[in-house]
């Protein structure tokens, strides 16, 4: 799975072949087919693993004693995930295959609705737009070529500062 994730991050889903995945893990293409019948199954498995990471952050946030603490935990976790997954962020946010998958994947849509509700305190078209803008800004920043030399700690501090300002949160 990690080989496919890395290749998707580097080449996009469309630019990654099953042969490339097989070569990366040192097996035959037939061995990959034995585990996953189609490339779509690999895409789904990678996407579900990424969604599980987001869900874990959201669950930690929901466990907080008050909405402000939940927002802070969620925002920090989102930024940390984006920074840790910089290599994959481009595929997650701009790959047409993944975008189509996520747009039709009910668990993703439900997860994002929950995330935006915790982060913004409401479920409305405006909240969805604000949430989408914020997540796109975070994702875009971590993969932006002008910021590749910025160390993770500095990037994290700046992203949190700007995201808090966007959300009207203290700090």
What are these model-predicted stretches?
Residues 3, 7-41, 45:
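Helix-turn-helix
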Residues 3-10, 53-61, 137-144:
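Solvent-exposed, amphipathic alpha-helical segments
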Residues 13, 59, 63-66, 146-147, ...:
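Short, flexible helix-adjacent loops and helix caps
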Residues 41, 45, 56-87:
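Hydrophobic alpha-helical connector segments
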Residues 69, 89-94, 101-171:
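Hydrophobic/aromatic-rich alpha-helical bundle segments in the mid-to-C-terminal region
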